[in-house]
Amino acid sequence: MELDVLTAISPIDGRYRGKTKALAAYFSEFALIKYRVQVEVEYFITLCELPLPQLKGIDSSVFETLRNIYRNFSEADAQRIKDIESVTNHDVKAVEYFLKEEFDKMGGMDDYKEFIHFGLTSQDINNTSVPLSIKEALEQVYYPLIEELIAQLKTY
């Protein structure tokens, strides 16, 4: 069944899609996966900055390359994570495996892959990703609309 007004799970994605479309970048399945990737990457970078002794060999020049994993995150990347999840039956573990693949593409990161998700639970990732998505949706969508409404009201 194709997603349209009549087959959507709720009127939010159906009837009101035109009004809520901007929120998809923050609350869709794609967005949640992207935020999970972002949290995992930033956590790994933070471990490197501590510095964790086992990660001393990572130069800070690689941090931008790591951040580009989520900055340039695509639907193909999200689909790859969903494909991994279909095998693992675990959404956050699939993100971890995806990041290990990305580390492989970078080269020279083999010794550090096991520090992706080090000391974390899935809930650590989820309980950071979801509030981050809410924060950014408020800043990028909701607050500007409220400011626009206030400006319009001031004209009366």
Language model segments and positions:
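A helix-coil-helix interface module used to build multimeric assemblies
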Residues: 2-156
